[in-house]
Amino acid sequence: MIARYSFLQNFAEYIIDKLKKGIEVQIILPNNLLCLKLKQILIDKYKIKLPIIIPFNAIFFKKNESDYISKIEELFILSSIITEYKELPFNLEESLKSAEILRKLFNDLIINNIDIKLIEVYNNSNYWQKIYKFLEICFLKWKKAISLTQKYTKTIHEFNILQEEIIKIKKRDKRIILAGIFKPNVFFKKFEEELKDYIIHYNPSYNYISNNISYSEPNNIYEEAKQIAYICELNKDKHIAIVTNDNKLKKVYCNFLDQKYSDLLGNDLRRTNIGELLTAIIKIICNNFDLKLLFLLLKNPLINCHSVQKLELMLSNQNRFISSPKYLLQLQFENEELKEYCANLIDILFTNNPHNITGILTLTQEIAEKLLPTIWEKEEGEVLIEFLTNLISYSKHINLMNKKDFPKIFSFLLSNIKHYKNTDSSSIIIGQPEDLVLCRFDLIILPHFNNEHWSPNAKPHPLLSKKALQILNIDYNDAITTMLYTDYFNLLLQNKQIVILNAKKYNGKLSTSCNLFLRLQLKHVIPWFDPKLLTPATNSLDIKSQDDHKLTTISHSFPSVLSVTDIESLIRNPYGFYAKKILGLYKKDNIWEEPKISDFGNFIHKVLEKYSKNYDKQYVCLNLLDKQAALINIGNHILYSTILPAYTKKIWQIKLTAFSKTFILFDIERRKNCKEIYFEIKGELRLNIAGQNIKIIGIADRIEVSKSNDITILDYKTGTIPTKKEIEFGLSPQLIIECLMLLENGFNIKSFSNLETSQLSNIHIGRDTVICSRAQVVNPSYLKNYKSSCINKKLTIAYVRITSTEPYIQTTEIDLNIETLHKHKAGLIRLLEYYVTNKSFSYDFNLSNYNDYRHLTRCYYINS
């Protein structure tokens, strides 16, 4: 059953009754939202002269900053004291975070008139005595430093105002009505104790509960956010409250909301677009040139533009490792406009290089104004320029050893300032339980409703034990107690409709149901949502759906030239093959992507190719150490001419050095039994498939011909090598196809030019005869040559895995015969015949572990 009137409506009648009796009252509510709503009710319904209605914090909040030192200044004073204390070493970032803790502790000691010496002897352990000595020295120095400013701290200033207001209330003999539920803190405790004879409490009733409560458990936090957005969309004509006190979760929820909303939680300024813009500028100023940092700035929504997107595309792939701004202007620009944009950008960002904090902050402001002339006119601009101005004036307190640490410090300071996004016309409001609990809504959404979120345990003080806090008589449990959470929950259940959500997983952890909800289930039957009602309908795509969870798309053509890796892609990921080879879509390596394993593999292949091809001319007569030095020197020369991060070059040099000796020995040993070796040799295999000529191309890393005419095709691998089963089943066909190329003289090697290609491609092996596939007998002259040069030869494929840790070289060899190769060739032909004929490409989630084209299907299946 729902309460007939809301708490505020009942309270409004109570106020009218008091006023009729001639009682002068001052009304204090927990927050400003309740004050505004109560005033609106009194004006609309009763049309009376309003009594004084204020939120509790308005009693002591007087914005006259000349009377007290700012929070930033106080943090810097404490930070300086902490860093000077040599017994416990702190860097600047650590000292600022500790300053926030000590600031609260020291202000509470002053407000409560407590001597810190009370805890001096409670524990005689060496650890505690060190902590106590640290606290006492910092406390005394802090008091002295504050007194020298001839001002109060903000907390003490507000407490003094509160005491003055208490005296005024007593003199006026005015009744104070405290209506609602207030969070416990030292200010409220003092107010209640001093004015207990003047205060009238008006508390809400807990006797009602809605008959429209539903529950759902989405799979993860993103599904929960989608459900919230969908529920809001379905109920856009209603007054909706989303109740949460977690800013991270709120951000996820808001990313999915299409409607306007009011935000009572607020965002710290570092999370706003302007805050992120300033932080990105400071990161660029305080660090060496880095394209990732540059595009972190340029992709900011406030300055992102078409030129940024073009520049990013131009700098993707290998250009993403450019290490200096001067190299940017040496690139080939598609037009003068983009070149001019890039030149202006370099001039703005990289002309000056300040070394002190004042210079960094001043330059940050100048750069921000050049990049966005209207920056301070934005929604948060006024607050941010005030913060920046204050920080510049206090920057003399920042003693920074390394300016690379300053971005973290700036971000931390910025996080202490809140910005609120409130829209009067919005029907959705997001806030904490204490902000929304006494308001009436058409729909309440309680997301992430679990014990961790709704029954948080009080966090232990980082410096003081529970016993020490008891001795000091300081209540640090500022978080809402478990009892208050119960009250809030019961009051929220009085609204018309309540939707309770609890994502099964968040941050990799399983969620558990909240105890409050479990107790509710004992008394009431709570229906579960039908998931179909919570999932937005998806637009059907013009893609053929199949029962085996495949998507199929049709092409009008099939390429005539394929690489051996294209064949593997066609087997493992047909849709990826279609996107790459037919649509011509190639993945670009993004600016922020680190060098990949494949990049390292390409580097090693270049080194080994250059060494191997020049071995007979330059290195054959050298001793082992000189050969090793030559190999390493080749790598250094290649790295010198390659655009890569300095740390990557160093790592690759270390890896190359690690396996160089083992590779030299491996190479020497294999050369002993070889009469011919071919390196990085190009090959091709020509086929006619269903009337279409197909050419398959590939490059063999190394082909060895032994003195006994045995042939081995080697492939160097710096990553994982395929299993024997993958090779046998044709899932990794690279070396198999290279063998087929070899048999058909696709590598143009003279040793295999004795037979005509057309005859070689169709041979079958019998006991004593060789016939072609059309049942024609091979020319006897060719048969003699073939038997001498091919039949007696042993064909082997070998994967050589190269690593920078022992064992440095691992070789996996597989012997092949003509029958096996013929079966693989027949399978290759059948594969190509299917795609050349049908031109139908399916996508299967289980075929490929690495898939750059998955998102192109625009359709996702959930595995059952």
UniProtKB/Swiss-Prot annotation:
Coiled coil: none
Superkingdom of the organism of origin: Bacteria
Protein name: Uncharacterized protein RT0391
